[in-house]
């Protein structure tokens, strides 16, 4: 592994060329000790590539650097290893290697990416959390990028449901970005994994985020966009997903809402529409992934009154007055039912007398 770590450190040698080395049977160790004249037999190397390799070999201490890396307690895998995610092997420009803290996604389980706007609405926040939680209860892994907004909401929804979630970073795996997500970062390490193709210690840079998006989509079976503006980075993830042959789904939105522009545009391009979370989860869940459906889960917890009130709520706040006109209960009784739903975690009161679903 120490020679693979050296090859990974040559960041100016592209992933594509590292993959070609692998395909040609040229291991990292063989490259490290290859005579200078034989480097010219590797026709896809440029003179600059050969210069990078020769200069690195002259100054790089393989043993020392590998020992220093091992002290960081970070996992490391390359496309030459069996543990490398199979879903990434055949995408365009697969990362030669991955660093991770925690674990890599379980190859035997489905994964869904949930991404979207950083400056999301309260509605988008709730949808992302509820969707992630619903999928997690069916044993589906959640992939996202730990950015502010929808990414964070998706991770939180999964964790709150006891699921496994994985964050692909635009920095080194040992660099928490944004810093305010430190609590989330630590929780993901314990319940899933932090993943990056970048060398440990790498600070986040703007150019790294589009690069990591191809890994988010690549690790996933399905990509869901919750909210996205016209130039949202999550649309890059959607483009990668379509290029990789993955299904893309969106949460539809109001045509007057700038946060809906990206999703509505994807609908125009043929993306799937999530109009009911329970049905979406049911449709994509394969036999063997679930012990019970979402509706069964709720029926086991809610009584008839609670189920009725819950069915009338959405992820947009509804006033108590509007709600009272739709149920055959006195206002005092309705308040009691809502309070019970809040205690059970199914409903939130966003502002006094306005309620939304939280599950």
Residue ranges with predicted function:
Residues 78-359:
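Glycine-biased, small-residue-rich flexible motifs in mid-sequence functional cores and linkers
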């Amino acid at each position: 592994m120490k020679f693979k770590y050296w090859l990974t450190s040559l960041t100016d040698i592209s992933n594509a060329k590292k993959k070609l080395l692998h395909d040609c049977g040229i291991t990292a160790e063989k490259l490290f000790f290859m005579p200078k004249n034989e480097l010219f037999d590797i026709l896809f190397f440029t003179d600059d590539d050969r210069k990078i390799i020769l200069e690195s070999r002259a100054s790089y201490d393989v043993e020392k650097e590998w020992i220093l890396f091992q002290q960081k307690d970070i996992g490391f895998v390359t496309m030459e290893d069996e543990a490398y995610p199979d879903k990434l092997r055949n995408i365009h420009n697969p990362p030669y290697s991955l660093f991770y803290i925690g674990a890599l996604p379980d190859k035997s389980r489905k994964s869904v990416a949930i991404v979207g706007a950083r400056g999301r609405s309260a509605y988008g926040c709730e949808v992302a959390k509820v969707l992630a939680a619903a999928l997690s209860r069916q044993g589906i892994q959640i992939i996202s990028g730990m950015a502010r907004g929808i990414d964070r909401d998706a991770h939180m929804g999964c964790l709150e449901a006891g699921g496994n979630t994985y964050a692909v970073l635009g920095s080194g795996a040992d660099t928490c970005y944004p810093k305010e997500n430190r609590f989330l970062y630590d929780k993901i390490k314990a319940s899933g994994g932090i993943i990056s193709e970048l060398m440990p210690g790498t600070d986040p840079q703007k150019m790294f985020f589009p690069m990591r998006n191809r890994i988010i989509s690549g690790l996933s079976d399905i990509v869901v966009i919750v909210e996205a503006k016209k130039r949202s980075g999550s649309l890059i993830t959607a483009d990668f997903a379509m290029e990789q042959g993955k299904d893309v789904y969106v949460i539809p939105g109001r045509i007057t809402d700038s946060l809906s522009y990206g999703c509505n545009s994807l609908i125009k391009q043929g993306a799937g529409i999530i109009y009911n979370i329970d049905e979406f989860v049911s449709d994509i869940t394969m036999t063997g992934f679930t012990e019970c459906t979402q509706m069964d889960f709720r029926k086991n917890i809610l009584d008839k009154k609670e189920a009725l009130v819950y069915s009338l709520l959405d992820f947009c706040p509804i006033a108590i007055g509007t709600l009272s006109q739709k149920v055959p209960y006195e206002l005092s009784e309705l308040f009691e039912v809502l309070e019970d739903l809040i205690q059970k975690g199914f409903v939130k009161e966003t502002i006094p007398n306005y309620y939304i679903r939280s599950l």
